[in-house]
Amino acid sequence: MSHYSSYYGGLGYGYGSFGGPGCGCNSIRRLVGFGSGYGGFGYGSGFGGFGYGSGYGGYGYGSGFRGYGCGCRRPSCCGGYGFSSFY
């Protein structure tokens, strides 16, 4: 789970199923920038972040929970929508 469609609802490219750098990261870490895990921002934030591939409550491309864009984690259940969702 380190490329397209990371472990949990990442944007899809790069690596970082759990807090690693790159896009599509989704974990519970508190990083900032590319591949943020929890509450970060930028590409692939994990929880409450914003930008590409946020994991939970984020907004932008690939938000996971309650977000919008492509690569949402739950495209209909949690108010997110898009494509390339994993969970």
Curated annotation (Swiss-Prot):
- To which species is this protein native? Mus musculus (Mouse)
Q: How does it assemble?
A: Interacts with hair keratins.
Q: Which PANTHER family match?
A: KERATIN-ASSOCIATED PROTEIN 19-3-RELATED, KERATIN-ASSOCIATED PROTEIN 19-4-RELATED
State if Phosphoprotein is listed as a keyword.
no
Do you know what upregulates this one? Expression in skin and hair follicle is regulated by HOXC13 and by GATA3.
Annotated protein name in UniProt: Keratin-associated protein 19-3
Q: Does the keyword Transport apply?
A: no
| Annotated Gene Ontology cellular component terms | cytosol; intermediate filament
- Protein role: In the hair cortex, hair keratin intermediate filaments are embedded in an interfilamentous matrix, consisting of hair keratin-associated proteins (KRTAP), which are essential for the formation of a rigid and resistant hair shaft through their extensive disulfide bond cross-linking with abundant cysteine residues of hair keratins. The matrix proteins include the high-sulfur and high-glycine-tyrosine keratins.
Expression across tissues is: Strong expression in narrowly defined pattern restricted to the lower and middle cortical regions of the hair shaft in both developing and cycling hair. During hair follicle regression (catagen), expression levels decrease until expression is no longer detectable in follicles at resting stage (telogen).
Which residue pairs form cystines in this protein? none
Q: Which gene encodes it?
A: Krtap19-3
Q: What is the lineage of its organism?
A: Eukaryota, Metazoa, Chordata, Craniata, Vertebrata
- Region annotated 23 X 2 AA repeats of G-[YCGS] sits at 9-82
What's this protein's family per the entry?
Belongs to the KRTAP type 19 family.
Supply the alphabetized keyword list. Answer: Keratin, Repeat
